[in-house]
A protein has these predicted regions:
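Multi-pass membrane proteins that catalyze or facilitate reactions on polyprenyl-/lipid-phosphate substrates
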Residues: 1-79, 90-293, 297-418
Length: 418
């Protein structure tokens, strides 16, 4: 890990406390530069991102203490949206206020978003690439990566029979019912069953650091979230325009995804492929390429916006839909921060979230079958390659970056041999 430069904040040997971390304010530029480096180097998905954040902000810079960091992680796992990005926004907010929150998000998100927009424009300009063997290899990589996510999340979020059964029920819903209805239905099913039947042990509350958000601002954020959630579908219905429908679909995807990361896949597939915005082949190729990027997986929205067949595409479409998908998570974060200390003490809330998390595993399992498997596994060679890539991810613990590169090279090689 690189050592701090002379311009970095002095790192002392004493652990930070929540009060001290709140008092030590920094500049937006400081926040931007630290998160930009993380945005360029944080490979491995949301769980790995949280590890990078803890090393950087708790161990190295001491912007906050371990208890406060754990509380932020717990809150962002509880909320819909991209958990690692929400933790980053919360750290930026605590360090440099509202402008720091924006700086943290922009710096952490921009590197992978720009790279994916560039990849999309390359595919659009050189149309033959979409059907190339190397691009098909990226689709096969997506099978292995989503399977790994289902495997890991299942072990973590479905540790008992009741939650495993709930995940299976959610998977069946996603396969049998229309996509949008199935996903919402599975989340509601998980919330109801979790609140009614699950009994999770209570956890001690250890941190009481100020949130940096007033209750008035929290209520305003929640109201704005609800207005957009209800108003965007009406706008899309009244205008009958493709752009309004895209904004509504991507906002809804950001608002309904629990767990972040790969869980956004079925929601984005509904918002883009099912509406004819992009082809299934381009969708999976972009999803495979996104695995090789640092930073949040939600930047896949930038690829889809750039590839869009609607009124906006290229840089404008990519940047617009990138912003749209992150808005609900940011609003929910600022709405929840001032009330989290009260919410986390309620057993019903913990049980409900546990049920939703189990349903999320089922939603992702359904997406693994359709569209990921059905679009990528076209023969025995594809199945063998997917199995190899899965083993490298799970047992050899390869980085997704190397798995994606191997998949592209293998796909190209198989294209010559078959």
């Amino acid at each position: 890990m690189p050592h701090p430069s002379p311009h970095d904040e002095h790192v002392d040997s004493k652990p930070a406390t929540g009060a001290r971390a709140q008092a030590d304010r920094g500049s937006c530029l400081e926040v931007f530069l630290v998160f930009l480096r993380l945005g360029l180097t944080s490979f491995g998905g949301p769980v790995a991102h949280l590890g990078y954040f803890r090393t950087e902000f708790v161990d190295r810079r001491r912007w906050l203490d371990d208890y406060t960091f754990s509380d932020l992680v717990a809150l962002c796992q509880f909320l819909p949206g991209p958990a690692s990005s929400q933790v980053g926004m919360a750290i930026g907010l605590r360090r440099a206020g509202w402008a720091g929150m924006l700086a943290a998000w922009v710096a952490f998100t921009l590197p992978s978003a720009l790279a994916l927009i560039g990849f999309a424009m390359g595919l659009a300009h050189y149309g033959w690439l979409s059907g190339s063997a190397a691009i098909h290899g990226l689709k096969v990589a997506a099978v292995a990566i989503v399977a790994q996510a289902v495997w890991g999340m299942g072990r973590s979020l479905c540790p008992d029979r009741s939650r495993a059964a709930l995940a299976v029920a959610a998977a069946l819903l996603t396969v049998v019912l229309p996509a949008a209805l199935a996903q919402i239905g599975a989340v509601v099913l998980g919330a109801v069953i979790g609140a009614a039947f699950l009994q999770l042990p209570a956890r001690p509350v250890l941190s009481h650091a100020p949130s940096g958000v007033s209750r008035a601002a929290g209520v305003a954020s929640l109201v704005l979230f609800a207005v957009l959630m209800a108003g965007l579908p009406l706008w899309a219905l009244i205008s009958s325009g493709a752009l309004a429908g895209q904004i509504d679909g991507f906002y809804r995807a950001g608002a309904l995804v629990f767990g972040g990361g790969h869980v956004v896949l079925p929601l984005l597939e509904t918002a883009s492929v099912s509406t004819g915005m992009v082809s299934s082949a381009d969708f999976l190729a972009g999803y495979g390429a996104a695995q090789a990027m640092p930073g949040p997986l939600f930047t896949f929205a930038a690829f889809l916006g750039a590839m869009s067949s609607g009124p906006l595409s290229g840089w404008a479409g990519g940047l617009l839909l990138l912003c749209v998908i992150f808005v609900p998570g940011a609003l929910l974060l600022t709405a929840a921060l001032p009330f989290w200390d009260t919410l986390r003490r309620r057993p019903g809330v913990r049980n409900m979230v546990a049920g939703v998390n189990a349903s999320v595993v089922g939603i992702l399992l359904g997406a693994l079958y359709d569209p990921v498997w059905t679009s990528a596994i076209l023969g025995k060679a594809d199945f063998g390659l997917a199995l190899l890539l899965f083993a490298l991810l799970v047992y050899a613990r390869w980085s997704p970056l190397w798995v994606v590169l191997l998949a592209a090279v293998s796909g190209w090689s198989l294209g010559w041999l078959v």
